[in-house]
Each structure stands twice: as C-alpha cells, then as structure tokens.
Amino acid sequence: MVFTQAPAEIMGHLRIRSLLARQCLAEFLGVFVLMLLTQGAVAQAVTSGETKGNFFTMFLAGSLAVTIAIYVGGNVSGAHLNPAFSLAMCIVGRLPWVKLPIYILVQLLSAFCASGATYVLYHDALQNYTGGNLTVTGPKETASIFATYPAPYLSLNNGFLDQVLGTGMLIVGLLAILDRRNKGVPAGLEPVVVGMLILALGLSMGANCGIPLNPARDLGPRLFTYVAGWGPEVFSAGNGWWWVPVVAPLVGATVGTATYQLLVALHHPEGPEPAQDLVSAQHKASELETPASAQMLECKL
C-alpha cells in the first residue's frame, strides 16, 4: 500500500500551486514545440537543397506546429506563443498588464532554447551542407532556418508595412475565433482553426519575409545564431532588418485589436456571453484550484 501511494505523494510534492509559475511553464513548452517543429521543417528543406521540403511544406509544418502548441498549453497559459498576441490580450483585458513582460521573457527564452535544440538536431546536416561555413547571405546561407530575413527586393518601409498588416490580420482572426458573441468555434477546435489561419497567412503573405508576425519567434532565434557562429551579420543583414519583425508586429497587434473591437466586438448586443472563451475558462479553473492565499498573491502580482 505504501508503494502504491508513493508515486501519488511524489507527484503531489512536485505539483506547482502558483498560477503564474504554471502559466510560465506551459508557455515555455508551447513555444518550444512551436519553434522546434517550425525550424525543423525549414532546416530539412534548406539542408537538403529543397529535395526534402519546400515553401509549402514549411508553412504547413508551421501551421500544424501552432495547432499542437496551443493544445499543449491552451488551458493553462492561454498558449499565447507570441508577444504580439499577449499584447492584444492585455488591450482587451484578458491578461493583466503586469504579466506582459513575464510572458514575453518566457517566450523569448523558449524560442532561444528551441533554436539550440534545432541546431543540435541538424548539426551534421548543417556541417554537410555548408562545409562548416555558417553564413547569413549567399547560396549556402543557413541563418534563415532560425530567424527571418527580407527578400532582396524588400525595403524596410514595405517590410514594416508587411508585418503590421500581417500581424493585424492575425489578431483580427484570433479575436474572431475567441469571440463567443460572433460565429464562434466548437470548444476544443480553436487550435485547429488557428492553424488554418496561420497557413492562410503564410500562403498569401509569406513571400516578402516569411511572415514572422512574432517578435519572440524572430528575436530569440536571431540571438541564438549570433552566439552560435553566424556572428553580427544576423543584425546587419537586410539593411538592419532585425528590428522590423520585433517592433512592427506589436504595432500590428495594436491596430488589429482596435480594428476588431471598433468594427465588430463593440457593437454586439448587451448581455451575458453565450459561453466562456478559452482564456476566461482557464482563469476560472485556475481560481478554483488555487488556495485563497495564492489568489491574494496573484492579485498582488
């Protein structure tokens, strides 16, 4: 009897009671899954000379990765996976502003770590493809496996607009999916529909710079490549492109949130919502599981 109870007791000691800590762990794992699968698809295509992957397979893998990542952490952290979406959730009141920098830090750290995992996984393939010469530009460049870079014709102004518009479309779509006063999505299928949204964006807006739309997805891997052997050119390439996929998605998230709220959400009839959205349900469940003292601490945070 003692032996059968031991695993349960151990699990009880390991269980984390803090809501914020659980959210951080779930967000870290979700971003890690997203990045490893997305970068793996790109690495497979690039290092094989596109004999084992292409433009379509990269975006398909990325959309499926988003779906899986949301299932991983959706009911714990909300599976934001993206500082731009976290910002949108703060704007609409679904995430406390005080948690925004914490979410962003976790997302950046996870993207950095996932890039390291991708590098280790494809280390031999990278060495074979490049001959040990890791470059940011040129016919054998491999930096784009990890971070995004603009097409040769793309100006910074057009690239900035690309990211504002693309992220705005992303946020409009996500808010519509989560809006129970609108058409809505059957419970549990939200991740699938979000994956379809990502695929549509990739296939329609991916040519200019690969639709980063996510500051953590771009900056975390870029920092990794800087320290892993690609050097400072990861920041100077594309006329100093690096800041565009960091700043523009945040602008796009603000624009997209304001657009959906002003044109759709604000005009719903007054009254209770038909059903709780994924994030609200998660918070309610967390409150029921969290002791009163922990809830007080959460409020202070």
Curated annotation (Swiss-Prot):
Aquaporins contain two tandem repeats each containing three membrane-spanning domains and a pore-forming loop with the signature motif Asn-Pro-Ala (NPA). Glycerol transport is regulated by pH, with the porin being permeable to glycerol at pH 5.5 but not at pH 7.4. Water permeability, however, is not influenced by pH. The chain crosses the membrane at residues 23-41, 56-75, 97-121, 159-176, 189-205, 242-262. It comes from Homo sapiens (Human). It holds the Pfam family MIP. It is a multi-pass membrane protein. GO terms for cellular component: apical plasma membrane; basolateral plasma membrane; intracellular membrane-bounded organelle; lipid droplet; plasma membrane. Detected in epithelial cells on villi in the ileum, and also in stomach, jejunum, colon, rectum, white adipose tissue and placenta (at protein level). Expressed in duodenum and jejunum. Highest expression in absorptive epithelial cells at the tips of villi in the jejunum. Detected in subcutaneous adipose tissue. Changing residue 133 to Q: Abolishes N-glycosylation. It is found in: Apical cell membrane; Cell membrane; Lipid droplet. Residues 1-22, 76-77, 91-96, 177-188, 263-301 are cytoplasmic. One of its GO terms (molecular function) is water channel activity. This is Aquaporin-10. GO terms for biological process: glycerol transmembrane transport; protein homotetramerization; response to toxic substance; water transport. Homotetramer; each monomer provides an independent glycerol/water pore. The record marks 80 as: pH-sensor. Residues 42-55, 122-158, 206-208, 224-241 are extracellular. A motif (NPA 1) lies at residues 82-84. A motif (NPA 2) lies at residues 214-216. Glycans are attached at residues 128, 133. The gene is AQP10. In vitro, it can transport the dietary compounds erythritol and xylitol. Aquaglyceroporins form homotetrameric transmembrane channels, with each monomer independently mediating glycerol and water transport across the plasma membrane along their osmotic gradient. Could also be permeable to urea. Among aquaglyceroporins, it exhibits a unique pH-gated glycerol transport activity, being more active at acidic pH. It most likely plays a central role in the efflux of glycerol formed during triglyceride hydrolysis in adipocytes and in glycerol uptake by enterocytes, as both processes occur and are stimulated at acidic pH. It catalyses: glycerol(in) = glycerol(out); H2O(in) = H2O(out); urea(in) = urea(out).
